[in-house]
């Protein structure tokens, strides 16, 4: 058993969310454990230990669940369960948005670009978290896509999913009347840009540190150290899987 493997109780919680009772040659628990192992260790598919099912089968389920939205479903439900467990409402009232530019792997990938500000050639993760640092939404774009442009896509993706969301906090990189309009029209929320009043002195912006901490948490998962994926949908799924891995340990 590896440190990333699920306990029986943890697997039962995820299995209830997946809700697929078809008979299989290999238990879903073994397949999930293999994917969590890859997420944490950052290894290639073909290097999966023999204790797990074949890498081809594991990859098949990974892609199937990317396309079917299963990773997002698991991540969303676990977040609701965890929020309730710590005494909060299942749906958050505050979101915090930020981005992280990540280098791509050495071999050529589509959907990549150069972030002139961070001097990174690759892709950019745009994430929204709640006040616990739990993932609400993730979108991956080429690194040259401006934060304000990507934030529009994030807000559109979040539409209809968070009925209590009253405000989204952002830093000075997110500007534009359209973001304010989209937050109000799509989410019935306020989009608030929070900046440091004194640029000459470092100050922690209230609650902004939460999303920065979440990004640091994701960096503990070596599959996220670079972007190795052939498409951005898989890139987004690995962020969701990292979030699942962190939350399931709380149960």
Regions found by a protein language model. Give the residues of each.
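Short alpha-helical elements
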Residues: 1-251
């Amino acid at each position: 058993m590896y440190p990333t493997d699920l306990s029986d109780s943890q697997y039962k919680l995820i299995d209830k969310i997946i809700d697929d009772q078809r008979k299989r040659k290999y238990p879903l628990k073994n397949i999930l454990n293999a994917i969590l192992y890859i997420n944490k260790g950052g290894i290639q598919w073909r290097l999966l230990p023999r204790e797990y099912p074949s890498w081809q089968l594991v990859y098949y389920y990974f892609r199937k669940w990317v396309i079917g939205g299963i990773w997002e479903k698991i991540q969303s439900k676990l977040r609701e369960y965890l929020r309730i467990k710590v005494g909060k409402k299942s749906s958050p009232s505050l979101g915090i948005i930020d981005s992280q530019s990540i280098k791509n792997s050495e071999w050529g990938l589509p959907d990549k670009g150069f972030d002139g500000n961070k001097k990174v050639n690759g892709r950019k993760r745009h994430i929204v978290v709640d006040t616990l640092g739990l993932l609400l939404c993730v979108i991956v774009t080429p690194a040259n896509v401006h934060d304000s442009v990507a934030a529009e896509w994030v807000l559109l993706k979040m539409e209809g999913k968070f009925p209590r969301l009253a405000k989204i906090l952002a830093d000075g990189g997110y500007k534009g009347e359209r973001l304010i309009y989209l937050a109000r029209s799509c989410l019935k929320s306020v989009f608030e840009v929070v900046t440091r009043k004194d640029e000459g002195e470092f100050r922690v912006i209230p609650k902004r540190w939460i999303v920065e901490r979440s990004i640091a948490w994701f960096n503990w998962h070596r599959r996220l150290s670079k972007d190795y994926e052939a498409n951005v949908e898989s890139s987004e799924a690995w962020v969701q899987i990292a979030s699942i891995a962190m939350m399931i340990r709380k149960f």
